[in-house]
UniProtKB/Swiss-Prot annotation:
This is Putative pyruvate, phosphate dikinase regulatory protein. It comes from Rhodopseudomonas palustris (strain TIE-1). The keyword DNA damage does not apply. Bifunctional serine/threonine kinase and phosphorylase involved in the regulation of the pyruvate, phosphate dikinase (PPDK) by catalyzing its phosphorylation/dephosphorylation. ADP binds at residues 153-160.
Length: 279
């Protein structure tokens, strides 16, 4: 058993980019704050010769071995070596593929790196990212009608990171700040195609986030209205009034992570699209 402050070797073996392994392993290791994984990433392992080098490194630094390999011979050799040196190993996609095969009654194509094929979905994500970056923070409002989603909200309601997250899912997302004393762009008043979502947070949460932002910028508390409780409360109320006036969807992000906010927006978008499908 590892003690606090110790480390362990984590070997990630993939016949593709290794991104899947990295994402999964880091999600798990984040739950163990007191031990440190030493990552060894081996991408594009597709031959016996390439695997030989990997096995040598695993033998020199035994630890947990996670892999995404489709070639049966490579899998068998890797698992045999791990068993020989008493290193636990696990196929990340194997159990998932078995579940799919059992349910669908069909075997896989066994295409290495198939999840990274440059298909229509990939180019859709690139297009969405380009659009979202061009339409961040109220820029190019004349193109808002081309969005799938338009996010509005007062300062520090996570509009930009949520936009980028959604864009990574292929959703064209623009965001427009709601600023006290400044009229909203008239384009927001007449949108037909996009889903407009108004992001809200409690005044307490906004003040906390804004104070941290000012400190990170070394700005101190000189901008009193930015963190003044009454001023912030007025901002929140104004945003709610605008949302009610224009029929925007309301989403409270006070206790939501970016991922949770994006998931809620994607559900709103899916529900809206279902309602528009003629029966």
């Amino acid at each position: 058993m590892l003690t606090d402050g110790s480390y362990f070797h984590l070997h990630l073996v993939s016949d593709s980019t290794g991104e899947t392994l990295i994402t999964v392993s880091r999600a798990v290791t984040a739950q163990y704050a007191n031990v440190t994984p030493v990552e060894h990433v081996y991408p594009l392992v597709r031959s016996q010769k390439q695997l030989d080098r990997v096995l040598q490194e695993i033998e020199e630094a035994p630890g947990i071995v996670l892999f995404t390999l489709l070639e049966t011979e490579l899998v068998n050799r890797l698992e045999a070596k791990c068993q020989e040196i008493n290193s636990p190993s696990l196929s990340i996609i194997g159990p998932v593929m078995q579940l799919f095969e059992a349910y669908l009654g069909a075997s896989t194509m066994g295409r290495v790196g198939a999840q990274h094929t440059l298909n229509a979905e990939y180019f859709q994500r690139i297009d969405a990212l380009n659009y979202s970056m061009m339409h961040d923070d109220g820029q190019h409002v004349e193109g808002l009608e081309e969005a799938d989603v338009v996010l509005v909200g007062v300062s520090r309601t996570s509009k930009t990171p949520t936009s980028i997250y959604l864009a990574n899912r292929g959703i064209r997302t623009a965001n427009v700040p709601l600023v006290a004393g400044i009229p909203i762009p008239h384009q927001l008043e007449t949108l037909k195609k996009p889903l407009v979502v108004s992001l809200h947070a409690s005044p307490e949460r906004l003040i906390q986030v804004r104070q941290n932002r000012l400190l990170s910028l070394g700005a101190g508390s000189g901008n009193d209205s930015y963190i003044d409780r009454q001023a912030v409360t007025d901002e929140v109320l104004l945003a709610r009034k605008l949302s009610a006036k224009y029929g925007w969807s309301l989403l409270d992000v006070t206790r939501r992570s970016i991922e949770e906010t994006a998931a809620a927006i994607m559900k709103l978008l899916a529900d809206r699209q279902r309602q528009r499908v003629p029966e």
